[in-house]
Curated annotation (Swiss-Prot):
Organism domain of life: Bacteria
Organism: Vibrio atlanticus (strain LGP32) (Vibrio splendidus (strain Mel32))
Modulation of this protein's activity: Inhibited by fructose 1,6-bisphosphate (FBP).
Signal sequence coordinates: none
Lineage, highest ranks first: Bacteria, Pseudomonadati, Pseudomonadota, Gammaproteobacteria, Vibrionales
Name recorded for this polypeptide: Glycerol kinase
This protein's record includes keyword S-adenosyl-L-methionine: no
Amino acid sequence: MTEQKYIVALDQGTTSSRAVILDHDANIVSSSQREFTQIYPKAGWVEHDPMEIWATQSSTLVEALAKAGIRSDELAGIGITNQRETTIVWNKETGKPVYNAIVWQCRRTADICEDLKARGLEDYVRDNTGLVLDPYFSGTKVKWILDNVEGAREDAEAGKLLFGTVDTWLVWKMTQGRVHVTDYTNASRTMLFNINDLCWDQKLLDEMGIPSSMMPEVKRSSEVYGQTNLGGKGGTRIPIAGIAGDQQAALYGQMCVEAGQAKNTYGTGCFLLMNTGQEKVTSKNGLLTTLACGPKGEPAYALEGAVFMGGASIQWLRDEMKLLAGAEDSEYFATKVDSSNGVYVVPAFTGLGAPYWDAYARGTIVGLTRGVNSNHIIRATLEGIAYQTRDVLDAMQADSGIKLANLRVDGGAVANNFLMQFQSDVLDTEVHRPEVTEVTALGAAYLAGLAVGFWDSIDELQDKAVLNRTFMPHHDEEKRNRRYKGWKRAIKCAQVWSELHDDDDEE
């Protein structure tokens, strides 16, 4: 029998699908990535094609193996991590989606959320799912599909349709329709899962008109869910052994497995998570209570603050504003000036997430004067990412009563030294950047590897977390507080705009 030398992480993100292959020392030996189409049918609507998600994800695995000359029988297992909340409904008989995937960023269900609030469900949702009633989560997206796609509700009630977040869709495709599962971390992001009883919430399913027959079975984040045949019929059978939503996978990859440990991922959005162990902390400051992974992949509680626009605001500078040739250029231009010249950029392009939860706020640039140039705008955009992180961290520390000694960071934007230093300054906290910043993939690989015995224990993995750099805070307290006060004023401007806004303005 061939020695199983490798573990695979499939990392299905908002803009691309990736496959990462790791060896026993948790070194990345091969990877492949493919971007896929972003679909914007109307203002504030965001969709993906589920078949394109599957095609790009499956092809990256084949490419990653081929790049390194690795045979499928050398793989010990596969872990999956995914963009969360993004909603797919498909026909289990044909295997075809009934509609495009509705992406977590999509705001089309704001009116459904307002209706549920009017029916008095806001407190019930918070107390039982840990979430706020917001279009961000899966529940209202499922309802929208059933209400708006011809024949969908009838087929759902006849037991023909299945719902899944992206992990569920991938596992279903990889097992050729044999396995319909999700894990606790992804289930906790649907606004349909009771995090007190750890089961689907029948009251919420009934309130949204979603048949329970559509829902996947919920399992731990580290166990064997099924096998996939690599190479088609008669190919090598590889266990699918780990699933976690991208942010919980990153928390695990950073080895934040004990209460009080926290990380921030700077991806499309920014996501700050703090593990609270077996204690469910209910936020009084606009944060979410969600499920994460304990040391063995068992469900644990966490506090989360979600910022919708992180790295995506740098992409906006590049793609829409044409101020950058490449996202990596933002650091160079930001450091060409010694301040943002009084400018604040609030990137509320799809509303504001934690701790504000304002679906109607919109992007705002304030403080413009005649002396402001493009470098100031670029710098202010990067600073806006850091300020949003402070908004969340302040709320998190207030809820938990824990003052963080440091913040562990990961994601594409952490390569930006200006952003990381400014983050440390605005938080007055050490920022720790790991040597391997692919911690989302690491987390999925670790969960799968532990389930199949590729690694023996969490202790074996703790030693693999090597720091690349520690950023120390520089700013004095008076300067820090003055600048943050300006940010809070800018946030108010973004929110007041929505209060004054009329749909006729866009005609």
